[in-house]
């Protein structure tokens, strides 16, 4: 593997944060400097965590996922008062979801290792699976290439239930068929059989979406020491009850903190992305298998416009009796993470970084400082045939990132023709229309009754010119079909659907192409934290 860094333009909060703009950096409690991380360790030493209870739960959960010895040792290390975590999270996408999930985990592993060495304290990597999520449409699919088009392949469970990812049972038979359909779109390689067995082993050990995700990730990172946590596990929820109570008792202050911080963001020229009602409580409650967001209504906690209503005492009583019925929203999830884990750093994507900038005063309301927020490592893989296509078209590896691939294609095609087709036909249409307008005036003078027919005649002539233009373009494209197919392959590989590769393609394609140790070999590279994009030639 050969790795190269390129600068890809970013916008908004992320761009200004990475460029060191003081105004946006003031919305975070720590700069990304070594001194700031040292200060973070000191700040965490002054706080108390329920470490032993957490360790007991994580040991049981990770052992169930057949964690490697390094993971078990890291979980046990969390019981020590001077052990800290680098953490990131994601929904439980089928087959692990888009590549950026894998890249988040790689980011967590690398930063944890680096900070352990530089700070001289134990730092363990943790990945938080968002098991409370009920939106199956966000996790039940993957993208494949079929018939020279990118297709969204959705898993349709025969017995769908309205439940969280932690509780939604998978039909193993249906899921196996879905996986087979996906692999039919991949080329058969020397690794295909082993990869399918690898996936099937994980599926066979699973009952739910989160189980399947957890088993796959654990097998993929078996020797890394990665700790997994299901945010909606009933045993974890029991440990979180005291903090849920705290949020319920301070929900007005939480909402006020969010509002005030969003005003700061607006004054700095950014548009807030978290949308909440002014009476939001920022906690979900599961009612009749539905995740209902609670709101304040004259001292009562209500859901679904008053369909459900609880007093403070009733809500607290239900929390103590059935904590698994409660979960956090986008505002309180980071707070719960901060309550549960001694977090040295949180790693997030561009969207997460933007919405965390709106949470500073929310953290302060609860008495926390926001942990250092580190943008995750971004990666694009370029296979050998795509590198050859780039070379043949005299394109640099950075060109598809800095330019629209369709525009690159159009520019290349126009350079193959002496005179631009579009311009020549625009001129021709104008000249012909001018002549025809004059002709219509003449016809109108001689026989006004033919005016309508003359107008239709102009339309027909214009239609024929456009048909000629389309036929000419089609023939030119056919002449250069080999080269234009190279542009299509480049777009599909590097900018599928006009998006970054890591937001569309799934890691299983690369496991099938390069073997089950693909992720291990990617992790052998050293990635920088300078905000640049990493291009890996395979």
UniProtKB/Swiss-Prot annotation:
Recorded GO MF terms: ligase activity
Keyword Signal: no
Coiled coil: 460-484
Keywords for the protein's UniProt record, in alphabetical order: Coiled coil, Ligase
Enzyme Commission number(s) from the entry: 6.-.-.-
Pfam family for this entry, one: CC_BshC
Assigned protein family: Belongs to the BshC family.
Function description: Involved in bacillithiol (BSH) biosynthesis. May catalyze the last step of the pathway, the addition of cysteine to glucosamine malate (GlcN-Mal) to generate BSH.
NCBIfam families, alphabetized: thiol_BshC (TIGR03998)
UniProt protein name: Putative cysteine ligase BshC
Organism encoding this protein: Bacillus cereus (strain ATCC 10987 / NRS 248)
Gene name of the encoded protein: bshC
